[in-house]
Amino acid sequence: MAEFQGIIVIHKEKGFTSHDVVAKLRGILHMKKIGHTGTLDPDATGVLPVALGKGTKLVDLLTDKEKTYEAVLHLGITTDTQDMSGAVLKEREVSVTEEEVKEVLRSFVGEQMQVPPMYSALKVDGKKLYELAREGKTVERKARPVCFYEIEPLEIHLPLVKIRVTCSKGTYIRTL
């Protein structure tokens, strides 16, 4: 059987890790040389470019590019995972206007220093941060430079705010 070469675009469903998608493709295509171009959270849905065969040589070119995400912010809730999959730690009433929300979103545009969340696939000493977090451990993470090129509010129905974010690689939307 001929090996596939190139890049394919997969629509990742909620509940699967990026690694799950690659593992499934390895089984379907009977190939070992397959890789994705960046980790999407298990709860995220959307485009996951996957490199096959010689296409894996292009991964660095793709991962250095800006990325665009759509997300829904739920104002007034703090969770242990910084997303809605986690346990609620704090809840408070939201008393802001749409204009104040837009102003805060605009304030994030540009260069920022961002601390990666504990619930992320970033590795420390060979172990993924989310594995350590599930064990109840917290480790110090260094702030990293990221850039928000654009943050556009798509819908505002307080306390929910749907946004489109165009940002640099390595940016965690959940930390907004």
Language model features by range: what are they?
Residues 1-175:
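Catalytic/RNA-binding core of pseudouridine synthases
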